[in-house]
Design a protein with these regions (language model features):
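Generic short amphipathic/hydrophobic targeting helices enriched at N-termini
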Residues: 16-21, 32, 88
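Short, positively charged and aromatic/hydrophobic N-terminal segments
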Residues: 6-8, 13-19
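Positively charged n-region of N-terminal signal peptides that target proteins for export
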Residues: 2-3, 24-29
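Extracellular/surface-exposed low-complexity segments
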Residues: 4-7, 43
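Short helix-onset patch at the extreme N-terminus, typifying the N->h transition
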Residues: 7-9, 30-33, 52-53
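Bacterial N-terminal signal peptides
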Residues: 33-40
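N-terminal exported-region signature
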Residues: 43-237
Length: 237
């Protein structure tokens, strides 16, 4: 870490790593320029100009299906704002109490079925890239800060970290392990399933420390009861 730039989760410094997705932070008045590859925020170079961290995240969407999330607050977090102009042949599937809602971008008319649909940080959703190759989406907005809360209902939901940070789900990202919980991560080879044993207080991953979640990655959560995924986060501490 250079030039004194640190981020904190509660009273602890964020763990160093990841070089998956570049993130840059900008605001209005120049204070410092720093390299933040050690911040855990996706191995990034950053220019920080004030306490409000505004920046971008580049996310690659493979051909076909993936589960992603919006890692930054962008206005009202409307699909039309988050994905920008002409994002390509994309269809978004958002999961809720009534099942999936489907929202497609029409490349001929250059508009979404519902451009006002909201995809806020903390919500995961499927994206189907119907193009011939992987596409890159650039998310632009503010890093969520303060006392953050993400509702985890009983049963299945699709969620993500509200902070654009890669790390172990519970130890780094503050995911609650108050009961037995199962996490399903979707990739090129299908699902990777990680379960937490509340009696033995460990995950069934090889290191027993739980799954690693990437920046702008969404995943399924299965819980026996509802709770909130809470975290205090600030870029200025």
């Amino acid at each position: 870490m250079k030039k004194g730039l640190t981020l904190q989760f509660a009273s602890d410094k964020l763990p160093a790593h990841t070089e998956i997705i570049p993130v840059k932070m900008r605001t209005k008045t120049l204070i410092l320029t720093a390299f933040v590859g050690a911040l855990g925020i996706a191995g990034a170079s950053a220019q920080v100009y004030s306490v409000n961290a505004v920046g971008y995240v580049n996310k690659s969407l493979p051909k076909g299906f993936s589960i992603v999330s919006n890692p930054l607050n962008s206005g009202g977090n409307k699909v039309s704002e988050v994905f920008g102009a002409n994002p390509g042949a994309l269809t978004i599937y958002q999961f809720g109490d009534a099942g999936f809602s489907v929202n497609s971008f029409d490349t001929d008319f250059e508009e979404w079925d519902n451009g006002d649909a909201v995809v806020a940080p903390g919500e995961g959703f499927f994206v189907n890239n119907a193009g011939d190759a992987a596409a890159t989406v650039t998310f632009v907005g503010e890093v969520p800060q303060g006392d953050l809360s993400n509702a985890l209902p009983k049963g299945f939901s699709i969620r993500s970290s509200q902070v654009p940070q890669e790390g172990k789900l519970d130890s780094d990202l503050g995911f609650p392990t108050d009961e037995a919980v199962t996490v399903y991560q979707y990739g090129a080879n299908g699902y990777t399933i990680s379960s937490y044993d509340a009696d033995f207080e460990e995950w069934d991953t090889d290191d027993a420390a739980g799954p690693v979640v990437g920046v702008a990655e969404g995943f399924w959560v299965l819980r026996e009861s509802a709770t909130n995924w809470t975290r205090s986060f600030s870029t200025s501490e």
